[in-house]
Swiss-Prot record:
Residues where Mg(2+) binds: E446
Gene Ontology CC: one annotated term: P-body
Catalyzed reactions per annotation: Exonucleolytic cleavage of poly(A) to 5'-AMP
Composition-biased stretches (Low complexity): 774-785
GO molecular function, one term: 3'-5'-RNA exonuclease activity
Descriptive protein name: CCR4-Not complex 3'-5'-exoribonuclease subunit Ccr4
Organism field: Neurospora crassa (strain ATCC 24698 / 74-OR23-1A / CBS 708.71 / DSM 1257 / FGSC 987)
Amino acid sequence: MADGHRYMQQSFSTPLPTQFASNNNLATGLLLNSLLNQFIADPSAAQQQAAAQANPAHSSATQINRGMYGQNHPQGHNPRLNGAAPGRQPNMPMFYNHVPQQGHPHQGHNAHHQVLQAGHSGHGARNDLMSHSTFSSGIMGNASPYTTNNLQNGHSVAARGGPAEQPANEHWQKQMRLKEESDRAHSAMTEQHQPHYYARLKAPENKGIGGSLTAGGANASGDSEEEVRRRPYQVEKRNRRQDWHNLDMSGQGLRALSSALFSYDFLVELYIASNRLTFLPAEIGKLRHLKILEASNNLLSELPPEIGMCTSLEKLLLFDNQIRDLPYELGSLYKLDILGIEGNPINPGLREEIVERGTKSLINSLLEQAPVPLPPSPRKPIVVQEDVSPSLERIKVMTWNILCDKFATTNMYGYTPTGALSWEYRKERILQEIRDRDVDMLCLQEIATDVFRDFFSPELAQNDYKGVHWPRPKAKTMNEKDAAAVDGCAIFYKGSKWILLDKQLIDYANIAINRPDMKNQHDIFNRVMPKDNIGIICFFESRRTGARVIVANTHLAWEPTLADVKLVQTAILMENITKYAEKYVRWQPLKDKRGIQIPQSVSVESDIPKPEMPEPGPSQEYRSNTDIPLIVCGDYNSTQESSVYELLSMGRVTPEQSDFGGHQYGNFTRDGVAHPFSMRSAYVHLNGTPDELSFTNYVPGFQEVIDYIWYSTNTLEVVELLGPPDQNHLKRVPGFPNYHFPADHIQIMAEFVIKQRKGEKVKVIHGSGGGASGQQQQQQQLEGGQDFGSGSK
């Protein structure tokens, strides 16, 4: 039998194997039934079961007969021709390990099918795609009919996700379903010569006929509420440059991608499958909004590290390429739901991870196992003005949103390794950065009460710093433990150089609801009152020169939908700065600066020597509130196009300002908002230069300047600024924080000199009354230990 045909080829006189030939009536009935079944649908499962129970012998014979005539095997025939109902292909096994005898492709080996179907379950739903001619021809006569070396598509069984006997899990089933879709698209573009398969698939959607045909497409839900919680601007609105967001370049035979493609940074979906691409350019990292990248059926052997910049990716399909390894930067793709790698000679360890535990687990493994990257080049100081008189008073100021620990979650910052995101690591990096900068005035946002009290205050005291801190007002309604974790704002200052004269908390919501012109406005209660943002105002005097300066620090609302609230908060801040500046003009001079010393707790146990006290100078006199040097720092969550920036830089906002949005805020919306100070952002001096600061907040999807150091131009002059971060380093950094940048904001720093007032000499004020002892006691209350951990007097 091995050398001859098992069945008659020219006649139907013996249509069945010899074991059924004795029953001619049964054989004839079976043959007729088989022929008719080629033109009618199969009976339902219930009918088949009933027939089997009524006549077991007939059922068994029917199964054998159908196997003989190819009713239930995957040889490439259309299922309708084999008698199957449209869309129904039950129990369609695949012949991966079996090589049939030449010339007899229709023989069935059902026991073998079951094993192979389990080993390659992903193809089980599309058995009709298998090539009949390839499978049944070109086989040597002496080939073993049970070879297991290779599957029909050229892959070994071991390369298809493990032993064939083990059923695929849900992760791998999803992988194989997408692989089949990719195969179908590739077949249509190469065999049927129909390129742009995905554009054709989405044609109804593009015409507005139906919804998205592809899961996870442009119409898929965007970022979660938690992911955008602290993003100060709507990314989708800002980057809407076109009415289209998808591009299909598949099936074109492309060998390289033009660099012009990557200028379309608004793309959400990019299809470059079924080409001849051997690499992806590093510019792929510019497509920061990309959610789907289909690059299957190419000749890719590796992925560029810059692929990690595409943190919006949800689906990355790389089926049937030549990729052996994956870059660690792929771990930054924390939103990736599916990584299609089937058909690649991928590293066995990576393959096992994705097969057993899925894409999310593989991405997280790459993220956590990645080595710490090399540090960036240090940020350079940029001299703005040279030849500054050494006799002028200098003030170095830094502001920094340090990212409160309770906000640093893996959901929010999934692209950051847990080691770099932990507070224990970040707080040490922040502390070291503060010490290295050695500024006179330090303004911090998002600093919790316990962090201020238990960590920064005692640590920075060793470096001659004293501090003032207030938490958000909601801390008043909490128990002591919960209140300690509430973040707020802080101002640290060098105690050997500056004396704290006064400090004030600006509670925006409380002030707004108690204003006579606003307390009856519904918008105040509905929009402003729920936000518990604050500001701090401190009044200092220089020990050496007697110059006085006002330093304010604030953190405004973050929501992009609350532009009106941010404007109201800024207006309240400037209104109170104006009010307190008028009070500070009349502030009594200090009579005995020598008696106002740094508390002994600052330097008793420190290895750093106690700083020498300068020879004190007399307190200076100011005629108006605008004469006092003013510095206003903070995280404003507002860009240069905002009304907040307009108010601070121009000094006025009209009632017609669009950011008010039709809401009513008393005098602010009736008369407009104004302040008397001439103010400028310190970093304006770098605009238009190679060192221009392009961001202060750096996270995926948002890189903008929203932190500022404002100063009064009539009293202060910028002499030096801290330059931007290393741009080359950022080409592979999707967002902060990371091992080298411990917060999602960067620190900005400016050094000022206090201008000498024209035509006026420094006046020595000889105060009268109120002995020195009482004044010293007042200063000790302001600057003493009770300031550490509490902003209230």
